[in-house]
A protein has these predicted regions:
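Short beta-strand(s) of the beta-wing in winged-helix/HTH DNA-binding folds
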Residues: 26-29, 127, 175
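GST-like domain detector, emphasizing the conserved glutathione-binding G-site
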Residues: 1-104
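Generic structural signal for individual residues within well-ordered alpha-helical segments
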Residues: 17, 64-67, 138, 162, ...
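Charged/polar, low-hydrophobicity segments characteristic of intrinsically disordered regions
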Residues: 170-176
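GST-like fold's C-terminal all-alpha helical module
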Residues: 70-170
């Protein structure tokens, strides 16, 4: 694993752009030089190479439910957190036209979605039901980004969501 410092623009170097012309992260470079970009594409590749534990499910129903929840976590949390970050963080001020109102709208939407997810987690330990899955990973990444980049935190009164957060962040892989 080679860490890339996005804050200093390492992902915009000629060397990195040769591997991923969009300059985005993450990027998985295989031993043969093949480069795979985009989180879910990388996760699917790794799942096929190392299928245990199955993060995308094993039955048709599990796969569909996990995919459904993964997409919801992407649309309801990850994408809005990215929008908030891009429209408020100093790092982006000379890279894009920042629209503070877009960040405010996204932030309000995230808060509303947290209430809904808290209710959803009332009857289950993990987002897609069953065990830990890529849906949990997507949500976890969104909340890590939200907390680190723009200070968004899970409110304490959302006890189901807070309990879920404690479960996923206490996993050994969360500390790796």
């Amino acid at each position: 694993m080679v860490p890339i410092d996005m804050m200093s623009g390492e992902n915009k170097t000629e060397e990195y752009l040769a591997k991923n012309p969009l300059g985005r992260m993450p990027l998985l470079e295989l031993d043969d030089g093949t480069c795979i970009a985009e989180s879910i594409a990388i996760c699917r590749y790794l799942e096929n190479e190392i299928p245990d534990p199955p993060l995308f499910g094993t039955t048709s129903l599990e796969k569909a439910m996990i995919e459904m929840w993964q997409r919801r976590m992407e649309f309801q949390f990850l994408n809005p957190m990215i929008d908030i970050f891009r429209n408020t963080h100093e790092m982006w001020k000379d890279r894009i036209v920042q629209i503070p109102q877009a960040a405010e709208i996204a932030s309000e939407g995230v808060k509303e979605q947290m209430v809904g997810l808290d209710q959803e987690l009332e009857e289950k330990e993990y987002i897609a039901g069953g065990g830990y899955s890529v849906a949990d990973i997507t949500a976890q990444c969104a909340f890590v980004m939200g907390k680190a980049a723009v200070g968004i935190r899970i409110p304490e009164n959302l006890s189901n969501l807070s309990d879920w957060w404690s479960r996923v962040t206490s996993r050994p892989t969360a500390r790796a």
